[in-house]
Amino acid sequence: MIREKKSFHLHMLSDATGETLISVGRAVASQYATSQVTEHIYPMIRNETQLRRALDEIQQELGIVLYTIIDKKIKLLLKKRCEKMEVPCIDILHPVLDAFQSYLGTPTNLRVSAQHDLNADYFRRIEALDFTIEHDDGKSPKGLSDADVILVGISRTSKTPTSIYLANRGIKTANVPLIPGIGFPEALLEAKNTLIVGLIASAERISHIRQNRDLGHGFAVESYTDRISIAEELIYAKRICERFGWPVIDVTRRSIEETAAAIFELLSWFREGKWKKNPS
């Protein structure tokens, strides 16, 4: 009988940035909450010298080895060394590539340029994050037309965390507060090729969040946390979204991930021309 390990080392080797590998490794490791994992990440492993350095570290802290490496020679060397160390060594892309090849009836094209595609994706996400931070909470309205998605809504409807989540997926996201009596920047209506989505939540949830966070936007304490006042803010926001034909998502019982998934679906429809923007 195998004795349960309370902690383990997870080594992740990639010939690119390792983002895909890290996501998979963490997703699987999270299923073993009773075991503490120590991550070791080795990106840009593209020659034998780099691999040997990584293997020397693995030798010091034996554990599970996951990898995404295209070069056959480097892969073979990695597997042989792991066999000698008697540690699991798993190519996480191999079964997926095999399934594609079998279904499509086409040999896998293992191209070095794919590494550059991954790197380009990484820098695209960095660019999206920079954009999103610059355009948080109504800042820099002149750049709204450059956004892929603009989130609108009253205070504390998860606009900022959802924006950051989308940016981490390479989506340039801005967010603009809808405040009764103040309005919104004209640039919002000039973003003709951008998906604009309204976020709402129950007055109870918003009141609870506001009571536990900094007060702002110039509201008096009472009106900022009062449920009746919040309900009026929500009515205002819903009317604005209805007026301009912007889809609305209720985030009351949604996680950030679930909200983002709904936005991804809307964005797909929008880009395919299935969502008619500003029907009025």
Curated annotation (Swiss-Prot):
Binding site for ADP: G153, I154, S155, R156, T157, S158, K159, T160
HAMAP family per the UniProt record, alphabetical: PDRP
PANTHER family: PYRUVATE, PHOSPHATE DIKINASE REGULATORY PROTEIN 1, CHLOROPLASTIC
GO molecular function: ADP binding; ATP binding; phosphotransferase activity, phosphate group as acceptor; protein serine/threonine kinase activity
InterPro entries: Kinase-pyrophosphorylase (IPR005177), PPDK_reg (IPR026565)
The keyword Nucleotidyltransferase is assigned to this record: no
Role played: Bifunctional serine/threonine kinase and phosphorylase involved in the regulation of the pyruvate, phosphate dikinase (PPDK) by catalyzing its phosphorylation/dephosphorylation.
Catalysed conversion reaction: N(tele)-phospho-L-histidyl/L-threonyl-[pyruvate, phosphate dikinase] + ADP = N(tele)-phospho-L-histidyl/O-phospho-L-threonyl-[pyruvate, phosphate dikinase] + AMP + H(+); N(tele)-phospho-L-histidyl/O-phospho-L-threonyl-[pyruvate, phosphate dikinase] + phosphate + H(+) = N(tele)-phospho-L-histidyl/L-threonyl-[pyruvate, phosphate dikinase] + diphosphate
The enzyme's E.C. designation: 2.7.11.32, 2.7.4.27
Protein name stated in the entry: Putative pyruvate, phosphate dikinase regulatory protein
UniProt family annotation: Belongs to the pyruvate, phosphate/water dikinase regulatory protein family. PDRP subfamily.
Record Pfam families: Kinase-PPPase
Sorted UniProt keywords: Kinase, Nucleotide-binding, Serine/threonine-protein kinase, Transferase
